[in-house]
Amino acid sequence: MSNFVPHKIDSDTSFESDLLGEVKAGFPSPAEDIREKLDLIKLLVKHKAATFFFRVDGVSMVDCDMDEGDIIIVDRAIDPYNNCKAVCFIDGEYTVKRVEMLGSKVRLMPANEHNTKYQPIEVTPDNQFIIWGVVTYTIKKM
């Protein structure tokens, strides 16, 4: 994540669209009437002042369904927890990884079993380290 430029949610940001109902993944059925309004910000963002959007740069997290070019939603108000996916700052660089917490030890785990280039990062007291925010959603282009 060398191009670390978060996109912040403004307090008046809203994106509302019509929710048409459920769609069957099997045999198609005729479209139903509009059931309700769907506000994507209300659905995807719990803490507007602490939520940011990032575009994924790289392939170290593909096994967690974070592919290059996807948008991740990161909430800084959520306390990190074991095995959460998070944007972390370590030694001057930002990265997104799965955070493994084992007692007082922290490891940043990549999720790409097909590429041995990505190895776990053991966080030590010598590292400059913070968990910047927890990933809450991934928005994918199909």
Language-model segments: residues:
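Structural motif
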Residues: G69-D70, C84
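Hydrophobic beta-strand signal
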Residues: I73-V74, V87
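Short, compositionally biased
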Residues: N82-V96, E100-V106
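Glycine- and charge-enriched low-complexity intrinsically disordered segments
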Residues: M101-M142
